Amino acid sequence: MQQNEKASLNTSAAAAKAGSYTGYADVYDFWYYHQRGDGLTVNGKPSYTTDKAVSEGLTRPHTTWNGDNVFGKAANLTYSFLNTFSSTPNGHTGPVKFTPVQMQQAKLSLQSWADAANLTFTEVSPNQKANITFANYTRNADGSLNTDTQAYAAYPGTHPVSGSAWFNYNQSSIRNPDTDEYGRHSFTHEIGHALGLSHPAEYNAGEGDISYKNSAAYAEDSRQFSIMSYWEVENTGGDFKGHYSAGPLMDDIAAIQKLYGANMTTRTGDTVYGFNSNTDRDFYTATNSSKALVFSVWDAGGTDTFDFSGYSNNQRINLNEGSFSDVGGLKGNVSIAHGVTIENAIGGSGNDILIGNGADNILQGGAGDDVLYGSTGADTLTGGAGRDIFVYGSGQDSTVSAYDWITDFQTGIDKIDLSAFRNEGQLSFVQDQFTGKGQEVMLQWDAANSTTNLWLHEAGHSSVDFLVRIVGQTAQSDIIV
């Protein structure tokens, strides 16, 4: 949605909510879900935009494998799995070589960072010098078993331990990162450090009384926005039901792209995320309805689709960059990185809300009572079974030169919601022609093609420039005015 249409959402909200129930009210509430920046204070903390979270949070070390304060330059890096070591930088001992399962999961974590930024990773043998090294430890410096720590890593640099990543093999999640999501999450987190990313604020495990309340410098410091954060998603209104991300999230993607540049070769074709995924990435793929998805999308091109058709939960799906969606029974678990356009969305069998963007979207609600809002662009909207509402927020949403199609309208069951136009005056219906006074709606039935044209002449406009084309016949009682 363009900025002036966002303003239209603001000015129309009160008018829409003043009447009977409207789908527009749902769209408005969802549109401002996780609004950030703009001088907001959330949880008693300043709200940061992604750019500010990157500059003042995640990239505070100002270091990359290309040198200090060298940003936006690609890096070709090596990595290895150490056979042994005498002690870690923190004095831990008891080396255990990475298992084949750990190696596989670490490589998947490396791949997720390379998808987002201009990074390549080449494995070398344990006796060769590598930029990033992986090893397990088991004991403290005094020889006692270490059961307290999880993992840690060093930033890039020229020191012998630079880029080293260390993992506590006594932790079940570290031993079994293929079945325990927190293990894979930890691998990706520590690799983030080895690439130059910090925690979003000045805190580390084991250093003082740290918590979201005490330690987070800004509101969005949680595992909903960044895999580099320590803090649970509930602090920022999310609910992952105990699940963890495997790849970098919205703010991480922006941060790693600041350090090494955006990878513009990643998924440039027509990519499907969720069910029927062709991403070849496990965390973007749902194979059944019990699969919990937690991800942020980086996608460099093509005509792309969010397919969440296999879920029966009520879902809220937003295709705008920088947005969050509630998918598969979780809250705020799917996001779209800045600079990404996802064109299409498919809902499931619950009562879903789908919001499009400025592209020519294809939105499919599926079964259930759905609310579809295409926003600007020439959109194709299919409600599916159930009592669906097709929402329009301003005259820009469906113009004479770029009109929407509603493909399966059921008269007497579905609704078209024009309540957002109330802020310009009450709408009225005309039969055969407009009077010129504005705020008039006309339905034009085309019997030969079994379609209806919905025209709207807005107040203050010299000509009629709003048009929606509908497959099937539509009555005045189907329109919310």
From Swiss-Prot:
The keyword Membrane does not apply. Keywords: Calcium, Hydrolase, Metal-binding, Metalloprotease, Protease, Repeat, Secreted, Zinc, Zymogen. Its cofactor is Ca(2+); Zn(2+). Binds 7 Ca(2+) ions per subunit. Ca(2+) 2 binds at G302, D304, T341, E343. The gene is prtB. It is an enzyme of class 3 (hydrolase). The keyword Secreted applies. Ca(2+) 3 binds at G348, G350, D352, G365, A367, D370. Hemolysin-type calcium-binding repeats lie at residues 346-363, 364-381, 382-399. Ca(2+) 5 binds at G366, G368, D370, G383, A385, D388. This is Serralysin B. GO terms for molecular function: calcium ion binding; metalloendopeptidase activity; zinc ion binding. It comes from Dickeya chrysanthemi. Ca(2+) 6 binds at G377, D379, D397, D404. Ca(2+) 7 binds at G384, G386, D388, D414. GO terms for biological process: proteolysis. Its EC number is 3.4.24.40. It is found in: Secreted. It catalyses: Preferential cleavage of bonds with hydrophobic residues in P1'. Belongs to the peptidase M10B family. Pfam families: HemolysinCabind, Peptidase_M10, Peptidase_M10_C. PROSITE patterns: HEMOLYSIN_CALCIUM (PS00330), ZINC_PROTEASE (PS00142). The Gly-rich repeats may be important in the extracellular secretion of this metalloprotease. The active site is at E190.
